[in-house]
Amino acid sequence: MVKGQGNVVAQNKKAHHDYTIVETIEAGIVLTGTEIKSVRAARITLKDGYAQIKNGEAWLINVHITPYDQGNIWNQDPDRTRKLLLKKREIEKISNELKGTGMTLVPLKVYLKDGFAKVLLGLAKGKHDYDKRESIKRREQNRDIARQLKNYNSR
């Protein structure tokens, strides 16, 4: 698990709804100068993003970073694939877990840690519709219990 997370810039709110997160991994992102300025301004979208292992390297795909306003000619394509910085052992471990198991790698958060952009990846398994309904039902029951306890304790 990740210890100290710095300034959270973006979160993938649908990830916990659509997937069951098995494990989390912290990775650095290779960004250009104008991209890091956009990330610091919280102009990043993780909605449809995912990560993939190709040729022994990890890549972040479909993550949109809006071009920096004053970037003019140095701005990159907003939807380009970006390299993730992981150790070889971590990449091998992830690729072994991803092989033929129906698992995927989903970005959960992007945050700044000591001036560097980091992404929290979740090793995830997709949920079925009935799993989603069950988790919603469980969440509502917990809210009702908490509400009743609050009312009971305030008497």
UniProtKB/Swiss-Prot annotation:
GO cellular component: cytosol
Keywords (A to Z) from UniProt: Cytoplasm, RNA-binding
Cell compartment(s), UniProt: Cytoplasm
Top-level taxon of the source organism: Bacteria
Gene3D superfamilies: 2.40.280.10
One family name in Pfam for this protein: SmpB
InterPro entries: SmpB, SsrA-bd_prot, SsrA-bd_prot_CS
CDD domains recorded: SmpB
GO biological process: trans-translation
Family: Belongs to the SmpB family.
Its biological purpose: Required for rescue of stalled ribosomes mediated by trans-translation. Binds to transfer-messenger RNA (tmRNA), required for stable association of tmRNA with ribosomes. tmRNA and SmpB together mimic tRNA shape, replacing the anticodon stem-loop with SmpB. tmRNA is encoded by the ssrA gene; the 2 termini fold to resemble tRNA(Ala) and it encodes a 'tag peptide', a short internal open reading frame. During trans-translation Ala-aminoacylated tmRNA acts like a tRNA, entering the A-site of stalled ribosomes, displacing the stalled mRNA.
Protein name: SsrA-binding protein
Gene for this chain: smpB
